[in-house]
Amino acid sequence: MKHLLKLGGMTPEEILHILDVADEYKRLHKDGVDPKDLQGKAVALVFAKNSTRTRTSLEVGIYQMGGLGTYLSASDLQTARGEPVQDTARVLGRYYDAIVCRTYKQTTLDMLAKYSGIPVVSGMTDYAHPLQVLTDLMTVRERKGTLAGLKAGFVGDGYNMANSVIVGCLAVGMTVTIACPKGYRPAADVLMLAKQYGDKFTLTNDPDEAARDADVLFTDVWVSMGMEREAEQRRRDFTGFTLDAARMALAKPDCMVQHPLPAHRGEEIAPDVLEAHADEIFDEAENRIYVEKAVLAVLLAGQ
């Protein structure tokens, strides 16, 4: 693995290896040990979108591993004044050992990977959120003991999270049902890939179908960053897609809930459902740091 731009193209073995490494980093940290596997390494954290969890977990994780993380917002870079992405990539590649980038367009990540000459990791784009779904998979496996054979349901917008849930969950042997309103389908190439899994994948407009007999239910915000002008229309379109107690009752009694946060209580998730599943949702928020450590260790330290 040279980069982590999306989950598509990763083998099940590569995904599970990252989860295994993340488990080990968590075990060691709980024992008071943080291996300095990034000693002498510098990572550029290029963020065109705001972030609480991804930014802070990366900064803390890189520090714990003995490395340096430099946060660069859009206003810190000359790309804001017209410098081509490929030129910024070439410069960062001379200074840093890796780049983690949260941006809007997937093509920006592709350009960074092509021209920087160093590993590039997606911190989220409009197309995919691979670190998040790897973290979800780690959290589900911790609690369920396995991934293969579980049913995953996603209720909400067929956007970046849904794209990565489809690819990641199918790759590790889960059955996936995605429920989204008409006009909010996942990416065409992701749906094409999902077809290869036959009846292990279902796309529906019925959120109850996604919830029925689920082992884990995923959801995400209805209005993602950059969509603020569409907010009212989206809220109307997503009426009936709230993960509420009635919908949870359709799932298995021990069904987990995963939400990437921040959560909009009363929109994509009911307040009582979020609180009932807060432990697993915030376990996932914690686990992000271990997955990020694992990805950087695989890319930079030969783990």
Task: Place the predicted regions along the sequence by residue.
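Active-site cofactor/substrate anionic-group-binding motifs, chiefly glycine-
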Residues: A42-V43, F47-Y95
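Anion-binding alpha/beta catalytic cores of soluble intermediary-metabolism enzymes, centered on
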Residues: D97-G168, H259
